[in-house]
Amino acid sequence: MALDLRTIFQCEPSENNLGSENSAFQQSQGPAVQREEGISEFSRMVLNSFQDSNNSYARQELQRLYRIFHSWLQPEKHSKDEIISLLVLEQFMIGGHCNDKAGVKEKWKSSGKNLERFIEDLTDDSINPPALVHVHMQGQEALFSEDMPLRDVIVHLTKQVNAQTTREANMGTPSQTSQDTSLETGQGYEDEQDGWNSSLKTTQVNENITNQGDQIVSLIIIQEENSPRPEEGGVSSDNPYNSKRAELVTARSQEGSINGITFQGVPMVMGAGCISQPEQSSPESALTHQSNEGNSTCEVHQKGSHGVRKSYKCEECPKVFKYLCHLLAHQRRHRNERPFVCPECQKGFFQISDLRVHQIIHTGKKPFTCSICKKSFSHKTNLRSHERIHTGEKPYTCPFCKTSYRQSSTYHRHMRTHEKITVPSVPSTPEAS
């Protein structure tokens, strides 16, 4: 404990610490903290317990910490609320989510060192929100905050698994096996329109939960990390394993329970990942585009005993897929399952890449700027469409009337006008009558 406190107080120079400015506090209307209670009483009790001890270092260390806390919090001058405000602010600064400590200090000063006014003026620009973690479990998947306890994640996904099992039993469809689920973990998501790539970290957690026969639930935890894409038209020669990796982990709970384990506390064992290309399909056969997917590393487990590549056909449409993970992602569209939910507006999406594109709207950020008129856009596709105004480019040409359009939406709207044109009927002949 002493080591942790020493680390806290030595992380910044004393003149820059908020505690050095406590002399400017105005006396609050609340009751003052007496020396006989609170930190003073606690520290004195701890010090007295070491009076008869031969360990002089422990006594000196506690005395030093007592002087630091007493000098910082000044309980004879400040009220309980002021002391609590200082402790709350200090914890906020060292909690790991604050990315602009200097800005937070300035806002603390401008608020008159009043916690309520400080909270009202504080914006999300000064903090890093918890990352979202993409979790697979027995065919079910969803996004969770990285701070969410693992117990809550498993309980939530277990309910989804039970609901799907009941639904499949009513429909007479066999439930998905764990072997099929293991193949799904290799899916890599890449959005061709929003200008971002996903580097996926795959983590497998086996937790022993005491629910209905103490069965072991298998979790696949994939943490999303966004990295800028190469410039359009460029080709990256990097090995996929340099930017994408899988982390396999096995964690078993004691006595069949999980005591609030978070994702950060799970031990990791590094291993090779299984990264695939974006979803591709063909109405005829998957063999027609095998040569275009030679960079995929998910070919393991996809071949039969004689080396013949196995394909996966959708039972509801003619599409065929090379990889099971692509088929499972495609089937979500038939079932209208949208497991990736925006935490802001609760809107659901089929793929994680679609959710990432949508979340830019809530941030209000417009990182894509036109080099000519300096107008900013939230998505790269909107910037490309806008740049065609300056260049005069109209890449979408109607095959019937040869009219060109700048935007695909306008082009498709025009094509629907041709579909409404009816083919003139052939006049009847005397023989036909």
Curated annotation (Swiss-Prot):
<dbReference type="InterPro" id="IPR013087">
    <property type="entry name" value="Znf_C2H2_type"/>
</dbReference>
<dbReference type="Pfam" id="PF00096">
    <property type="entry name" value="zf-C2H2"/>
</dbReference>
<dbReference type="InterPro" id="IPR038269">
    <property type="entry name" value="SCAN_sf"/>
</dbReference>
<dbReference type="GO" id="GO:0005634">
    <property type="term" value="C:nucleus"/>
</dbReference>
<comment type="function">
    <text>Embryonic stem (ES) cell-specific transcription factor required to regulate ES cell pluripotency. Binds telomeres and plays a key role in genomic stability in ES cells by regulating telomere elongation. Acts as an activator of spontaneous telomere sister chromatid exchange (T-SCE) and telomere elongation in undifferentiated ES cells.</text>
</comment>
<feature type="region of interest" description="Disordered">
    <location>
        <begin position="275"/>
        <end position="301"/>
    </location>
</feature>
<keyword id="KW-0539">Nucleus</keyword>
<dbReference type="GO" id="GO:0000978">
    <property type="term" value="F:RNA polymerase II cis-regulatory region sequence-specific DNA binding"/>
</dbReference>
<protein>
    <recommendedName>
        <fullName>Zinc finger and SCAN domain-containing protein 4</fullName>
    </recommendedName>
</protein>
<dbReference type="GO" id="GO:0000981">
    <property type="term" value="F:DNA-binding transcription factor activity, RNA polymerase II-specific"/>
</dbReference>
<keyword id="KW-0677">Repeat</keyword>
<feature type="domain" description="SCAN box">
    <location>
        <begin position="44"/>
        <end position="126"/>
    </location>
</feature>
<keyword id="KW-0805">Transcription regulation</keyword>
<keyword id="KW-0779">Telomere</keyword>
<keyword id="KW-0804">Transcription</keyword>
<keyword id="KW-0479">Metal-binding</keyword>
<keyword id="KW-0158">Chromosome</keyword>
<keyword id="KW-0862">Zinc</keyword>
<dbReference type="GO" id="GO:0010833">
    <property type="term" value="P:telomere maintenance via telomere lengthening"/>
</dbReference>
<keyword id="KW-0863">Zinc-finger</keyword>
<feature type="compositionally biased region" description="Polar residues">
    <location>
        <begin position="277"/>
        <end position="299"/>
    </location>
</feature>
<feature type="compositionally biased region" description="Polar residues">
    <location>
        <begin position="165"/>
        <end position="185"/>
    </location>
</feature>
<feature type="zinc finger region" description="C2H2-type 2">
    <location>
        <begin position="340"/>
        <end position="362"/>
    </location>
</feature>
<dbReference type="Pfam" id="PF02023">
    <property type="entry name" value="SCAN"/>
</dbReference>
<feature type="zinc finger region" description="C2H2-type 4">
    <location>
        <begin position="396"/>
        <end position="418"/>
    </location>
</feature>
<feature type="zinc finger region" description="C2H2-type 1">
    <location>
        <begin position="312"/>
        <end position="334"/>
    </location>
</feature>
<feature type="zinc finger region" description="C2H2-type 3">
    <location>
        <begin position="368"/>
        <end position="390"/>
    </location>
</feature>
<dbReference type="GO" id="GO:0000781">
    <property type="term" value="C:chromosome, telomeric region"/>
</dbReference>
<dbReference type="InterPro" id="IPR036236">
    <property type="entry name" value="Znf_C2H2_sf"/>
</dbReference>
<dbReference type="InterPro" id="IPR003309">
    <property type="entry name" value="SCAN_dom"/>
</dbReference>
<feature type="region of interest" description="Disordered">
    <location>
        <begin position="165"/>
        <end position="196"/>
    </location>
</feature>
<dbReference type="GO" id="GO:0008270">
    <property type="term" value="F:zinc ion binding"/>
</dbReference>
<keyword id="KW-0238">DNA-binding</keyword>
